[in-house]
Amino acid sequence: MQKRLASEQKNVLNARSRITRSGQPIMNTLFQPYRLNDTLTLANRFMMAPLTRCMAGPGLVPTEQMAAYYGRRADIGLIVSEAVIIRPDAQGYPNTPGLFTQAQIDGWKKVTSAVHAKGGKIFAQLWHVGRLSHPFFHQAEVLAPSAVAHEGTVPRMRELTYQVPRALTEAEIAQLVQDYATAGANAIEAGFDGVEIHGANGYLIDQFLHHSTNLRSDNYGGCPENMSRFALEVVDAISARIGGDRVGIRLSPGAYVHLAGSPEDRAVFDYLLGKLNDRPLAYIHLGIFDDNLTFDYLGGRASDYLRAHYKGNLVGVGNYDAERAAAAIEANRFDLVAIGRPLIANPDYLTKVKKGEALVPYADTMLAELV
């Protein structure tokens, strides 16, 4: 059951006029450097959320326009790239960039160079859509934890209906783990500062973590330990290649898109987060569109659940403006805030927020080009 926290909207105070315990304006907190770990210090507490733009060139190679697009946003503390597919059958949307060929790696080098030239940092978000793929993209089977189809049609290609996937074998799961690790190494070769594992929003890793999409009875299903196994194997394999301090993961303990949640899912995420606490990750990034949503089986907001169960860096997201984000950080609800659509509409988002200038409202028509 999902409900809106309407009272929070009513009770938010103007953070620009509020003072922290140290006597500084709350908004100043957002613009101070933030130390993720011994390896990475960010210029500020803003992150650019991963935003699928479907603008890759032939061969799913990043373009010069993409390099310029990310470069214009390099003042954000950490950019997380649009989701990047780790192998051909990972694709579920048209023209989404890959990170499994040398041409793709070389294309991303232009992107990372554009960001680094302006002093920024950028992670690649590693992605496999699982049952949300379609043979149209790769002329191969659709693979998932279990043979449970997603109802509906493929976004931006509504003539394509989702198909019943084939359940992965354990040998195929082992290969996927290695493919994630290879993508992580490719990201470092391409100049990324690290990677974010996409384990949220109903895609492949998330499908293993929810009972509605994981009906397995082998080593990857049936109990919290087994249902968490794939996610942890991916984390460990990538960390072994590039270092855990350069690895973040995005999670959706509250199922809100592409799959259904159930009370039994709570035990899976309790177990998973306990194990992630033992690993030196850069951060966990909440996956949700609106952090006012609450989930009965989590006891409230997904962000509050993650804060209570994970001791490392937490990235909040979900319809936050700078003032609400600053207040939430001051209240220790999370450590950094990811901004999504406002950064599509405002490449100069950080400058405008600093100056208190009005932001250009986001509109879907803006998705037609990279500005």
What function would you assign to each model-found segment?
Residues 4, 10, 19-371:
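Flavin-dependent oxidoreductase catalytic cores
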